[in-house]
From Swiss-Prot:
Record-level GO cellular component terms: nucleolus; nucleoplasm; nucleus; PeBoW complex; preribosome; preribosome, large subunit precursor
Biased composition range(s): Basic residues: 1-14
Chain intervals with Acidic residues compositional bias: 86-103
WD repeat residue numbers: 381-420, 526-568, 571-609, 612-651, 655-694, 710-740
Protein name per its UniProtKB record: Ribosome biogenesis protein erb1
PROSITE patterns named in the record: WD_REPEATS_1, WD_REPEATS_2, WD_REPEATS_REGION
Main localisation: nucleus
Compartments where found: Nucleus, Nucleolus; Nucleus, Nucleoplasm
Record GO biological process: assembly of large subunit precursor of preribosome; maturation of 5.8S rRNA from tricistronic rRNA transcript (SSU-rRNA, 5.8S rRNA, LSU-rRNA); maturation of LSU-rRNA from tricistronic rRNA transcript (SSU-rRNA, 5.8S rRNA, LSU-rRNA)
Summary of subunit composition and partner proteins: Component of the NOP7 complex, composed of erb1, ppp1/nop7 and ytm1/SPAC890.04c. The complex is held together by erb1, which interacts with ppp1/nop7 via its N-terminal domain and with ytm1/SPAC890.04c via a high-affinity interaction between the seven-bladed beta-propeller domains of the 2 proteins. The NOP7 complex associates with the 66S pre-ribosome.
Length: 740
């Protein structure tokens, strides 16, 4: 009932409002006043009868009750306004028609949609008005812009322009800045509310900061620090019980259990037989080796250029389905069966050996001191390359010579040049006090270049003699830096006997007027060819020289006491590069380009030939014990030979990047070094044991740098101090360095 009454009331209200609207129209017509243009009024009047007809049909009782007097009373002529009707005026109508309630389905129009207040959708889109307001007046449709205005409006866009017209109001829809920002955030899948922070700052309620203030300010009780008396009593009780035997330890309990089991154990007579049967059943079969997997070395359809000329394989097939079966399959299977049947297989356990354990454990360099580590002094004075060095037996004097033909004597401790002289290739000697121009003058007057190839101090400290090789001449000189007693003792080495005819020409210093100012030239020896190396015998009476360019007199041995020279070989086997005496035996070591031969001078026979395995030997040095030899080569290798072990190298050391020029052993310490064209001097520790079963210990110690490389030539000569772990090196830069 309530639904029907509400529906009646709504129809009454709508009818009442429509009647009021019609009367207002009649009054406006009677007065001749119009609120709209003629065209609009004419068009609207054409639609009024249909609207009026609908109202009359809906409310038939309303038109019947109105009388002519009431029409005259409320006409437009009387000037009165139309009274407003309330819904109560239509409640008593008997002829009111009731309609069934309309149920709007899913496919029907959305009549319940929310619209703007006071407006509803008009079904008359072609009318000039679009709706009625709350007073029942017409709401005129806004004027539609022309095409030109629309174009201008699309160019001059307002702020927030969208290009959408609201169908309710007919006006363009403009968006605010907040709405544009909201749409932008939604399009970028962001949070719509810009004030919302999805990642707020983390507030660590439980920090790692230790609070200094305690929860309770009460002081710590004494029982926290004093040992517990109750625990002490309990420990005493347990200790007393253990001593009395009332409490057993775990070891005592285990021992008692073993004793009880041994006392009551039953002996099984057949235990060993069963174990033997079990062991017999478990045979250790070695699995057969697996077949190799198929390979892809050959193609069934290779290109033409890969086909062999022979009739063997590979053969070419057009497709894989025409490839025949393998012809040797049965043969290979049969051979495999024979191998599995006849060939024994052994199971070998794999040895897991750490590779580090196979390497020898070398001591650290700090444990092998002393050895040279830094440059403490530089001797500067030579012009050009310094080719040879030699230290006196006392260790106080250093002799050097080079391409400038000047012999210089240096004081080791101070680095001062105490004496120097220029030697030419004609057997003349010129003294040079302190003028360097005299050196250049003497070199310019000589018709042949004077290059000091080698020099060596004699092994006798009481009779100091320096042997200097300049081209084909050997000078025996005593510099004026020694005492008179030492000088007289050195003279006696050359005046004990007259000179004899030999392979070389001997001349006394006094006859040839080779007496230098302050120094003495005892004798000169002229050989047929240029001399490359010198080597003194340990007794100081013999000197060996080598000449690579000579064949019959490549090696000469000069005896100072007799004043004679002899050639131990009628013809040399190759170009002799270096020669040296054995330190303990009457042996002579001769190094050619690829071999080192050891000769017994007493028996005049070949003792051993060392197979170096290098292309060109450059230098040679013998250990003080005489059982070990090292050589340097131009192919960047240093070879260590153990004469008691083998004729092949015991160790091949290849640490330099260029050719080796010189190698040398220390006279008394377990050290040896090598100088190379890369400008480096490498120092090694080489300890030799008296036990023949122990191998020598070789440890790299230090790389000494700072030598200049001139025209691809670096270090040319090295020599050790006879007592200290000091090393002297000379190179192509014209400087001599002392390493300590």
């Amino acid at each position: 009932m309530e639904t029907g009454m509400n529906r009646k009331r709504s129809r009454s209200k709508r009818a009442n409002s429509n009647v009021g609207v019609e009367k207002d129209k009649e009054k406006e017509k009677s007065k001749g006043v119009s609120n709209v243009p003629n065209e609009v009024e004419t068009e609207s009047s054409s639609h009024e009868p249909s609207f009026k007809k609908d109202v009359d049909e809906e409310i038939p009782s309303l038109t019947a009750e109105l009388s002519e007097e009431e029409e005259g009373e409320y006409s437009s002529e009387s000037g009165r306004s139309t009274p407003e009707l309330s819904p109560d005026d239509f409640e008593d109508a008997d002829d009111e028609e009731e309609f069934e309630e309309i149920d709007a389905g899913y496919s029907s129009d959305s009549s319940t949609e929310d619209v703007a207040p006071g407006l509803y959708e008009s079904p008359y889109d072609e009318n000039l008005y679009i709706n009625y307001d709350i007073d029942g007046k017409k709401i005129t449709r806004p004027a539609t812009p022309a095409a030109l205005d629309s174009l201008i409006a699309s160019i001059d866009k307002d702020k927030g322009w969208t290009g959408i017209v609201d169908p309710m109001t007919g006006k363009p829809v403009n968006l605010t800045t907040e709405e544009l920002g909201l749409l932008k955030r939604l399009a970028q899948s962001e949070i719509p509310d810009e004030n919302f922070d999805p990642y707020p700052d983390y507030d660590d309620f439980f920090t790692n900061t230790v609070r200094e203030t305690p929860l309770s300010s009460a002081p710590e009780p004494k029982r926290r620090f004093a040992p517990s008396k109750h625990e002490q009593k309990r420990i005493l009780q347990l200790a007393y019980a253990i001593r009395k035997g009332r409490i057993l330890t775990s070891e005592q309990r285990a021992e008692r259990e073993r004793e009880s089991q041994s006392n009551y154990a039953d002996h099984d007579l057949w235990a060993d037989d069963d174990q033997a049967t079990v062991n017999q059943r478990k045979l250790d079969y070695a699995p057969a080796p697996k077949l190799p997997p198929p390979s892809h070395e050959e193609s069934y359809n290779p290109p033409e250029e890969y086909l062999k000329q022979s009739s063997d394989f590979p053969k070419k097939y057009k497709s894989l389905r025409v490839v025949p079966a393998y012809s040797n399959l049965i043969k290979e299977k049969f051979e495999r069966c024979l191998d599995l049947y006849l060939a024994p297989r052994v199971r070998r356990t794999k040895l897991n050996i750490d590779p580090e354990s196979l390497l020898p454990k070398l001591p650290t360099p700090s444990e092998l001191r002393p050895f040279p580590t830094r440059c403490t002094n530089v001797f500067i004075g030579h012009k050009g390359r310094v080719r040879c060095l030699s230290v006196h037996v006392s260790g106080n004097w250093l002799a050097s010579g080079g391409d400038d033909g000047v012999l210089r004597i240096w004081e080791v401790m101070t680095g001062r040049c105490v004496w120097k002289c220029s030697l030419d290739s004609f057997g003349n000697a010129h003294n040079i006090d302190s003028d360097e121009d005299a050196v250049n003058e003497s070199l310019s007057h000589s018709t042949k270049s004077s290059i000091i190839q080698s020099l060596a101090w004699g092994p006798l400290s009481d009779s100091p003699v320096l042997a200097v090789a300049v081209d084909e001449t050997v000078y025996f000189i005593t510099p004026p830096i020694f005492s008179d007693e030492q000088i007289e003792a050195s003279k006696e080495l050359f005046t004990s006997a007259p000179y004899q005819e030999s392979s070389a020409i001997w001349r006394r210093g006094a006859k040839q007027s080779l007496q230098l100012h302050g120094g003495i030239v005892h004798a000169t020896v002229s050989t047929p060819s240029s001399i490359k190396s010198l080597s003194w015998h340990r007794r100081g009476d013999y000197l060996a020289t080598s000449s690579p360019t000579s064949s019959s007199q490549a090696v000469l041995i000069h005896q100072l006491s007799r004043g004679a020279s002899q050639s131990p070989f009628s013809k040399s086997k190759g170009s002799v590069q270096a020669v040296t005496f054995h330190p303990t035996m009457p042996y002579l070591l001769v190094a050619t380009q690829r071999y080192v031969r050891i000769y017994n001078l007493v028996k005049q026979e070949l003792v051993k030939t060392l197979l170096t395995g290098v292309k060109w030997v450059s230098s040679l040095s013998v250990h003080s014990s005489g059982d070990h030899v090292i050589i340097g080569s131009y192919d960047k290798r240093l070879c260590w030979f153990d004469l008691d072990f083998s004729s092949k190298p015991y160790k091949n050391l290849r640490y330099h990047s260029r050719a080796l020029r010189d190698v040398s052993y220390h006279p008394s310490l377990p050290l040896f070094c090598s100088g190379s064209d890369d400008g480096d001097v490498q120092v090694f520790h080489g300890r030799v044991y008296s036990d023949l079963l122990a191998n020598p210990l070789i440890v790299p110690l230090k790389i000494l740098r700072n030598h200049k490389v001139v025209d691809n030539v670096g270090v040319l000569s090295t020599c050790w101090h006879p007592k200290e772990a000091w090393l002297f090196s000379a190179g192509a830069g014209g400087e001599i360095r002392m390493w300590t």
